Amino acid sequence: MQFPESWLRSLVNPSIGTDELAHRLTMAGLEVEETEPAAPPFTGVVVARIVDIAPHPDADKLRVCQVDDGSGALLQIVCGAPNAAAGLTVPLARVGAELPGGMKIGVAKMRGVQSSGMLCSARELGLSQDHAGLLELPAALRPGTDIRAALDLDDTLFTLKLTPNRADCLSIFGVAREVAALTGTPLTAPAAEPVPVTIDHRLPVAIQAPDLCGRFAGRVIQGVNARAATPEWMKTRLERAGQRSVSALVDISNYVMLEVGRPSHVFDLDKIGGDLSVRWAREGETLELLNGQAVALDPKVGVVVAGEQVESLAGIMGGEATSVTLDTRNIYLEAAFWWPGAIAGRARRYKFSSEASHRFERGVDYASIPEHIELITRLILDICGGQAGPVDDQCVNLPVREPVRMRLARCHRVLGVAVERAEVAQIFTRLGLPFQEQGDDFVVTPPSYRFDIEIEEDLIEEVARVYGFERIPDVPPVARAKMHAQPEARRGAHAVRRLVAARDYQEVVNYSFVEAAWERDYAGNDNLVRLVNPIASHLSVMRSSLIAGLVAIVRHNANRKQSRVRLFELGRVFHRDPQLADGPLEVAGVRQPLMLAGVAWGGAVEEQWGVPHRQVDFYDVKQDVEALFGARADALRFVADRYPALHPGRSARIELDGQPIGWLGELHPQWTQQADLHHAPVVFELDFEALAERRLPAVRELSRQPAVVRDLALWVDAKLPAQAMLDTVAAAIARDPQLSVVQDAQVFDVWREKPVAGQTVTEKSLAFRFWLQDTEVTLDEARVADCIARIKDALVAAHNARQRA
């Protein structure tokens, strides 16, 4: 909300400067977003009057003006403005004046004629962008008066950023009320004595929807002059508040709305075809608004109708059919209390907002309607003339403001400072909050303009605002604290992040709420955790997997010509679990495990001249996953399985010590195509708890003896996983003390016979390499051969293997 400081100080004028006033308002919760001067700095510009004007002897478009600047002698000034005329009052930049932008005015000759100064347009003074002609000033101004004083150009424009709960401050008077409370300065309320009722004409009104309109007041005014000029003081205030002048009747309505926060509407009485009714709209009804927009109505929108013709969108905007024009002679002035819930969101449905709807959907004072009707009427009669009829004021359903109790002890506990009882009483008095003291409690009845006071904490906030947040001492919280030792065998979240980052992955953070389609496509989840009030319609469910969010970021980067992307996210997912009860960090029925997910797309390594380019594959990312587990990687198993997000033939379930902990694989071809990626990303998702546990290293003496390497090739069933044979080897080493010298075993070759037409290959050859080493003695050939034989026997027994010749 924007307004000039001078308007505010006409209602309350504390003895503090502009900067201090802005600071006080901001610290009280009315954030002053910006202050700027009403006009840029300039000097030497005065009010002047053109006494005589003559054509320039040597230029058709220039004229020679004789100007009275109040000095007693006429100045000769050459001017080319089309509106220059004798008798016109205009700004004059005298010789030596400095205009905005640093322009200095001196004596000059223009086509041979001396010019001692410059007559100015509004743009040359930085007041507006209008440069079509000279700025025309009121004729009542005295020549020689400094233009800054004459037009009050040393004013300051305040821009407030109000929170939605402070609807009472959406007016100059509302802000003035706050300033008076903060500074103790007397407040002058805008008011007008009831105007004489000189006609008895009434327009009948029926309120058919009390849940829409709680109070409706109006009066007929006849014989107005709609062509009357809006006073300069009113136009200036409106312009400095960001409103353009339209016509006297419209300007008066806007002026009162800005000054006291009362939206009103002026109907052209002669265009109203019947009695007025206030009701909810009906299906099929339409209305052309004042902004030229035609809207289709429905029963969720309130309207004012004349007979059966809709004339106004209740609390939002009037209709074009009954709008006032310069030819209007008779008007109906209306002001009403519209229930905030009946107005909220209605204007946004039609993709616009109005000053009226902005106020009504937050709450407008319902008790001061008659006084404001009188204020508007007085301005209309003073400016446009006319005769006023009686006020028709109907109250059918007004809010009932329940008293709110504030315990003084509770106030002290919340604020952390003991505000004296007498000071609390003084604060409530200055804020205009009627109260009763009951023991140590204050029972406050919220005024009709304070829709934000409903609970005890609201009153405590009022005390804090006026008492002053800066007066509340900074006291560190005192609480029992106990440092818990982190087990050495457990890693924290930051340690895991560092591990993943060391594998060349970059961390991202996605929303926890996602599209419902993502859950269906990527996680196969039909039991969704839906949001009651999503921040956006497409972010309506809680995620049960991190994979979809990572794929979306890969797509985002691919669309921006990135060729290699490696990302990870550590975050919570959400699963339905009827067995889960409420807890300090749990919500009943929803399990929230912490998961780690990663995605690799593009080159396996950064582009480099000495390394052939190839796309990242399953085994590259499998190696990354194994590296994250360190010494526990030997307990990992990658079991071929299917997952909705992954390629059915290139995905694996990850198990640790026999328990499933996640998934690894290429993205499903369907989702790869849907994301418009030219090759499939490889993704993984792991349970964080499995990663957090780690095996501590066991220190042992480094052997001084040479290692012996032996190979063993065996024929086995073609469908037998190599990991099954490695598990058999590990089990044999664990149970046979003679095999303790076997330090490592790896598969180094897989070979299959070339298939013959019509026959299926049933066997494959797996070649294993073993490293044997003793810490005490050098192994002889007999011991090595015995170890290899024992391993071969175990494999033959377990898998029906036979040695390859």
Swiss-Prot record:
GO cellular component terms attached to this protein's record: phenylalanine-tRNA ligase complex
Record keyword Secreted present: no
Main location: cytoplasm
EC number: 6.1.1.20
Reactions accelerated catalytically: tRNA(Phe) + L-phenylalanine + ATP = L-phenylalanyl-tRNA(Phe) + AMP + diphosphate + H(+)
Example GO molecular function: ATP binding
UniProt domain tRNA-binding: residue ranges: 39-148
Compartments, record wording: Cytoplasm
Ranges where the B5 domain occurs: 399-474
Domain of life according to the entry: Bacteria
Keywords: Aminoacyl-tRNA synthetase, ATP-binding, Cytoplasm, Ligase, Magnesium, Metal-binding, Nucleotide-binding, Protein biosynthesis, RNA-binding, tRNA-binding
Cofactor(s) this protein requires: Mg(2+)
Pfam families: B3_4 (PF03483), B5 (PF03484), FDX-ACB (PF03147), tRNA_bind (PF01588), tRNA_synthFbeta (PF17759)
Domain FDX-ACB: from-to ranges: 703-804
GO biological process entries: phenylalanyl-tRNA aminoacylation
Positions that bind Mg(2+): 452, 458, 461-462
InterPro entries: aa-tRNA-synth_II/BPL/LPL, B3/B4_tRNA-bd, DNA-bd_dom_put_sf, Fdx_antiC-bd, Fdx_antiC-bd_sf, NA-bd_OB-fold, Phe-tRNA-ligase_IIc_bsu, Phe-tRNA-ligase_IIc_bsu_bact
Record's cofactor remark: Binds 2 magnesium ions per tetramer.
Protein family according to the UniProt entry: Belongs to the phenylalanyl-tRNA synthetase beta subunit family. Type 1 subfamily.
Subunit comment: Tetramer of two alpha and two beta subunits.
PANTHER family: PHENYLALANINE--TRNA LIGASE BETA SUBUNIT, PHENYLALANYL-TRNA SYNTHETASE BETA CHAIN AND LEUCINE-RICH REPEAT-CONTAINING PROTEIN 47
UniProt name for this protein: Phenylalanine--tRNA ligase beta subunit
Organism of derivation: Bordetella parapertussis (strain 12822 / ATCC BAA-587 / NCTC 13253)
Taxonomy of the source species: Bacteria, Pseudomonadati, Pseudomonadota, Betaproteobacteria, Burkholderiales
Gene: pheT
